[in-house]
């Protein structure tokens, strides 16, 4: 069992895994565990510090979440964030109650006492609040380190016991010096910067070899970053026992199937088995409008196709997937985070399947996956491709998926990507795609009235996909995209731009 420098106990915040990501960026290996994990399991990880995450519950409620009491008797530094802060206060006898003024968004943090936790942090900085409860009194043995306009006890601590409590979220990018504070906490814990993708690759290769033995692994690839890195990692570990399969589900972008085959065969040197199952997928999606049903159908059909292919080969015991940490958090596998949406590659395999899962990327973030890809020798054009969802264009078409709607979306999507690349904006953004709204609107083309489809452009900036902001594209670029799509794609007469951030919206529409 791998030791963790810092354990993050998950009380249900959608930001929880950002805490681990921020620490890992600084070379500190942080691992998530459910809030109710046993003290024995915590001790087995031999952590140097513990972080209590935020969460949607209230410490005074009947259904409040509490961690094992032993957490506070280990003698380790503890950092409580938001709900974790209120839990620290509650456990030390302070009153926590509903706030008269809820705080959501940016706030000014004012430091009133300097200490190691605030090393490198200015006296006043912007932090990100997201809470509806308030600590009304200072716990015994603690002192105030910082306040905000609406929070007298915004940061308090017991410096002797190294217990720190923050009302805000340092892990969110909007907190200007949040990274610095987390780095300082890691130093207080005595952590060193030893976590990197080079060491991860070596350990993962060895773990894969030990697990697989003489059995074979069926690796599903889509051409996206995640599956490409999984295939490369497995090729390093078990080149003779690896079967790489690409399924054309009929939900890919223009020429994508051909590009995937060329990439794996020519650039990665992988013997790729290509299966055209487009008719099967589209037939099963016929008449289906609900996004969750679409995801489930696509996921189940993928598994079925892979299982059929696996039976053609002897000793196939495992199926490899590119499941990431962000997939897990949005499907609420860890801790008590509330479900946002299911992911096609999260949740295990059906009982009828005859092989087990291998998910070597399950505990790392997208930025770590990219660094791992470079470490494994993949080219930058592969590693820095925009993310593309497993369910493909099916979740970028509102409502029913059919060949005509797919064709419209493909044509619009090509134009968007062409314009972004020619203007130099493609590499500046995290993800860019079109959404076919399946909503008609009135237009005028020439002297004729039209009543045709509207398409939405979705372009976002992000570092890990956990949070995202819409890209501030130049108006001229947006105008070019709109003009070309309307003029070149028959059946579309309106283009809109999505200016929603995540949260509250998700990046994909379905």
From Swiss-Prot:
Q: What is its EC number?
A: 6.3.5.2
Sorted alphabetically, the Gene Ontology cellular component annotations on this record are: cytosol
Keywords for this entry?
Answer: ATP-binding, Glutamine amidotransferase, GMP biosynthesis, Ligase, Nucleotide-binding, Purine biosynthesis
Q: Where is the Glutamine amidotransferase type-1 domain?
A: 5-194
Which transformation does this protein catalyse, written as a reaction? XMP + L-glutamine + ATP + H2O = GMP + L-glutamate + AMP + diphosphate + 2 H(+)
What this protein is reported to do is described as:
Catalyzes the synthesis of GMP from XMP.
Q: What is this protein called?
A: GMP synthase [glutamine-hydrolyzing]
> Organism, per UniProt?
Campylobacter fetus subsp. fetus (strain 82-40)
What's the source species' lineage?
Bacteria, Pseudomonadati, Campylobacterota, Epsilonproteobacteria, Campylobacterales
């Amino acid at each position: 069992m791998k030791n963790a420098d810092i354990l993050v106990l998950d009380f249900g915040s959608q930001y929880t895994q950002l805490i681990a990501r921020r620490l890992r960026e600084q070379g500190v290996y942080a691992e998530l565990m459910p809030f109710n994990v046993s003290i024995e399991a915590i001790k087995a990880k031999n952590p140097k510090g513990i972080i209590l995450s935020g969460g949607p519950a209230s410490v005074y409620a009947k259904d409040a979440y509490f961690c094992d009491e032993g957490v506070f008797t280990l003698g380790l530094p503890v950092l409580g964030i938001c709900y974790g802060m209120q839990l620290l206060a509650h456990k030390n006898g302070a009153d926590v109650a509903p706030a008269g003024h809820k705080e959501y968004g940016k706030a000014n943090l004012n430091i009133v006492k300097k200490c190691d936790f605030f090393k490198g942090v200015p006296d006043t900085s912007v932090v990100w609040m997201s809470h509806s409860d308030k600590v009304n009194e200072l716990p015994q043995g603690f002192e105030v380190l910082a306040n905000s306009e609406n929070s007298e006890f915004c940061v308090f601590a017991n410096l002797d016991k190294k217990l720190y409590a923050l009302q805000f979220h340092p892990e969110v990018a909007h907190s200007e010096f949040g990274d610095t504070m987390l780095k300082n906490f890691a130093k207080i814990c005595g952590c060193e910067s030893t976590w990197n993708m080079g060491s991860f690759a070596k350990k993962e290769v060895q773990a894969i070899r030990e697990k697989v033995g003489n059995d074979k692994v069926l690796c599903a690839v889509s051409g996206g970053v995640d599956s490409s890195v999984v295939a490369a990692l497995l090729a390093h570990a078990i080149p003779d026992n690896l079967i790489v399969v690409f399924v054309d589900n009929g939900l890919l972008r223009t020429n994508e199937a051909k590009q995937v085959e060329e990439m794996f065969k020519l650039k990665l040197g992988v013997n790729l088995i290509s299966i055209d199952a487009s008719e099967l997928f589209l037939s099963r999606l016929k008449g289906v409008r609900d996004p969750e049903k679409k995801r489930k159908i696509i996921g189940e059909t993928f598994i079925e196709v892979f299982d059929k292919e696996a039976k053609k080969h002897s000793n196939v015991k495992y199926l490899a997937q590119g499941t990431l940490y962000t997939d897990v958090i949005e499907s609420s596998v860890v801790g008590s985070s509330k479900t946002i949406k299911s992911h096609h590659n999260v949740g295990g395999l059906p009982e009828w399947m005859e092989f087990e899962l291998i998910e070597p990327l399950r505990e790392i973030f997208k930025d770590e996956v990219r660094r791992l890809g470079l470490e494994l020798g993949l080219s930058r054009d592969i590693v820095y491709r925009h993310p593309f969802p497993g369910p493909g264009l099916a979740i970028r078409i509102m409502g029913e998926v059919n060949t005509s709607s797919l064709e419209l979306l493909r044509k619009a999507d090509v134009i968007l990507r062409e314009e972004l690349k020619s203007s130099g904006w493609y590499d500046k953004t995290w993800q860019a795609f079109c959404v076919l709204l399946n909503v008609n609107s009135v237009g005028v083309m020439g002297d004729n009235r039209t009543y045709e489809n509207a398409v939405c452009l979705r372009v976002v900036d992000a570092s890990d996909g956990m949070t995202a902001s819409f890209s501030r594209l130049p108006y001229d670029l947006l105008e070019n995209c709109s003009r070309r799509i309307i003029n070149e794609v028959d059946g579309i007469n309106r283009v809109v731009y999505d200016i929603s951030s995540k949260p509250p919206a998700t990046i994909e529409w379905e």
